[in-house]
C-alpha cells in the first residue's frame, strides 16, 4: 500500500518494498518525491517495526531538508546529500522533542 506525506506543501509517496541490498533500509528521492522503506526483515532485526519507524522518520527529515532548498548544502553532499549525523540526531531525538514541546504547550 502506498501512502503519501505532505512535506512543506509537496506530496511524497511512501513506498514499502523489499530491497536487493540488505544494507539499505530506506531512501528519499526528492527528484521523484518518493520515500522508499524496506518491508522485509531480511536481517532478522529483533524489533523490525521500530527500526522501520525510525528509518521513516530519517527519510522524512531528508525530504524536509530537500524541500527547504537544502538538497546538497552539507559537507558530504557529494556522497550522501545531507550530513547523516544531523539527520540521525533529529530522527532519534524528535519523539523526545515532541513530548517536550507538548508538555509546555509549545506547538
Positions of predicted regions on the chain:
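Metalloprotease/metallohydrolase-associated module, dominated by Zn2+-dependent proteases
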Residues: 1-51, 67-107
